[in-house]
Amino acid sequence: MRLLQKFTRKSSLKQSGSSSNYAYVTARVRAMKSNLLPREVYPRLMNMGIDEITRFIEESQYKQDVDELARTYDGVDLFEHALNRNLAVTFTKLINISEGELNYLISEYLRKYDIWSIKTILRGKYCGASVEEINDSIVSAGQLSYPFLLSLSEKESYESIIDALSGTDYYPTLKEYDGTNLSDIENKLDKMYYTGLSTTVNNPKSNDSKLFSKFIRTEIDIKNLSTLFRLKNAGVEKDEIADLILEGGLHLSIKEIEKLLPLPFSEFVQSLEKYPYWEDISGIVKTEMDSLIELETQLTRSNIKSASSFSHVYPLSIVPIMDYILNKTNEVHNLRIILRGKAANLDEEIIRNQLVI
């Protein structure tokens, strides 16, 4: 099974001998996108009990994943693993059917799942989580295979985990981990990922690499905004916030962010009115905010909306593919939030505020 194979990139921009097959992949993606759950399904799911929701998932596009994992897992754990497996299979398929520059760009973007899984494993070990609890959150949609990630989660110490990753690009950062500085290492991994993406499309020449660059830089803006809101609202000092800021944003350059860092929270909020993201968050943002869940949900929605609008303008480019990746990721996120929330008997309003619809 392809999911169980450790794959590597099939091409790079430096050895881009093969041409990209955008028309073929975008046609496949259109068909795949038709299988995504319509918006109107989520309110129905919110009115269902946990048994009805699990039955709905069993009868959906996730059926094969549920069936294959039913011998190993049950209950909510089964559906957590089924969602993660489906996401991994879906994104691995995109890599397998793409060629040339397109394959390279997709592969580089999906490295985020390598970092997600590595951080999940290290944080799980740090918090004393069981192997089963760690494996619930592993997603093998990047370049590290599922069996390899499982082998990492089964290791006893963080040192042995890092040693096993010595042949990867992540090792130079991971070897700085001493068992106490996990947050710092997680931040460095995130910065490494986005720096790598920025380097991938540095001085983009093709139209698709330019579109990809805009997509990535918008995502960096969204992440920086989320970081600024969260930390400034918590009263964190500007120097500490600056260490967590990602470079390469589209509308929020480092110079722009440096102007925002010293501002009190209320002035920071007012200063955002001149940026294009203000239109999406103006109805939510206040000078005093107890919770940022709704804001972060809206920022994610804004990112998806931006990609969707561009996908209609450039139908035979990388944009519809990135749009699909965002929407597929969001579908799994929404289903997971509903399942977890219902299983934990959370108030419906709390669950609803975390859904990106």
UniProtKB/Swiss-Prot annotation:
<dbReference type="InterPro" id="IPR050873">
    <property type="entry name" value="V-ATPase_V0D/AC39_subunit"/>
</dbReference>
<keyword id="KW-0406">Ion transport</keyword>
<keyword id="KW-0066">ATP synthesis</keyword>
<dbReference type="InterPro" id="IPR044911">
    <property type="entry name" value="V-type_ATPase_csu/dsu_dom_3"/>
</dbReference>
<keyword id="KW-0472">Membrane</keyword>
<dbReference type="GO" id="GO:0046933">
    <property type="term" value="F:proton-transporting ATP synthase activity, rotational mechanism"/>
</dbReference>
<keyword id="KW-0813">Transport</keyword>
<comment type="function">
    <text>Component of the A-type ATP synthase that produces ATP from ADP in the presence of a proton gradient across the membrane.</text>
</comment>
<keyword id="KW-1003">Cell membrane</keyword>
<dbReference type="InterPro" id="IPR014272">
    <property type="entry name" value="ATPase_V0-cplx_csu"/>
</dbReference>
<dbReference type="GO" id="GO:0042777">
    <property type="term" value="P:proton motive force-driven plasma membrane ATP synthesis"/>
</dbReference>
<dbReference type="GO" id="GO:0033179">
    <property type="term" value="C:proton-transporting V-type ATPase, V0 domain"/>
</dbReference>
<protein>
    <recommendedName>
        <fullName>A-type ATP synthase subunit C</fullName>
    </recommendedName>
</protein>
<dbReference type="InterPro" id="IPR036079">
    <property type="entry name" value="ATPase_csu/dsu_sf"/>
</dbReference>
<dbReference type="GO" id="GO:0005886">
    <property type="term" value="C:plasma membrane"/>
</dbReference>
<dbReference type="GO" id="GO:0005524">
    <property type="term" value="F:ATP binding"/>
</dbReference>
<dbReference type="Pfam" id="PF01992">
    <property type="entry name" value="vATP-synt_AC39"/>
</dbReference>
<dbReference type="InterPro" id="IPR035067">
    <property type="entry name" value="V-type_ATPase_csu/dsu"/>
</dbReference>
<dbReference type="GO" id="GO:0046961">
    <property type="term" value="F:proton-transporting ATPase activity, rotational mechanism"/>
</dbReference>
<dbReference type="InterPro" id="IPR002843">
    <property type="entry name" value="ATPase_V0-cplx_csu/dsu"/>
</dbReference>
<comment type="subunit">
    <text>Has multiple subunits with at least A(3), B(3), C, D, E, F, H, I and proteolipid K(x).</text>
</comment>
<keyword id="KW-0375">Hydrogen ion transport</keyword>
<comment type="similarity">
    <text>Belongs to the V-ATPase V0D/AC39 subunit family.</text>
</comment>
